């Protein structure tokens, strides 16, 4: 097994070479971009722990995300990306990788990158239909990890397969893969079908589901058992349909966690969401990922989402409606209404409502 320290040194060495090679040229070789998201949330106090029967409400405002990215084309076949993330008073490296595209059937990516799992998780936060991703995407779709991956396109099939060493708080190693197929496409209209898997080793590290009900500043009411996990096995299926102004996407995911005592906990969930461009235009699509609106204007959105913790006997559902207004390529406004229901064995159904607003500025 490749050690995480070795992979870290390799990635940092590669980035140093990238920096030297790039700055030896001219500054125009570096593409600097970024964005900032300012959020306001107002929600029932029932979405806070210990306030299940309260009729009060809470309101919060925050910088939800701020990102700064540096991209560089080093040569014909080599390029790099380095992205910093700023949120919750902390700074972290989001992306730090090199990509080689000189082979005919596959591209090679080395460094900190997104694992290939989950249509919604792979969609940039700037291009989401709703302010927040669904519960299942946040709970189980892997995010960014240090690793090495191969990806490519063969006819109408896009694929990615990688070996990763995530943060030790999540897993010690993982093999993750995704295949997406477009069986039908006419101009910008298309049907996308995808499957993905991830086999993750925990080696006794703690695993726990701990998620809010799609309201970022509310409490994490979905709290599963604390498990000293040996491994996690997860699978997902995905669908995306783009038809003129209309967008529909859906996913279903299952996960099984095996403890070091050889007991298992099962989880599953999914979502169905839509978007409709009132002002014309359509949603873009590239590399098996959903893109931004093609034109400025209004978009209405909606989502039904659920998450089930089987052994813990907990269920959560959300119903959301939203409206987005894209002013231009730099400025976007978003507003969502969320109704959330939560049930735990031995208790009653807890419900809450929320309004979430966002101002997004990109450069």
Regions found by a protein language model. Give the residues of each.
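Cleavable N-terminal export/targeting peptides
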Residues: 1-27
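Outer membrane beta-barrel
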Residues: 25-45, 49-203, 271, 276-293, ...
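Outer-membrane beta-barrel pore domains
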Residues: 26-27, 47-48, 53-55, 206-363
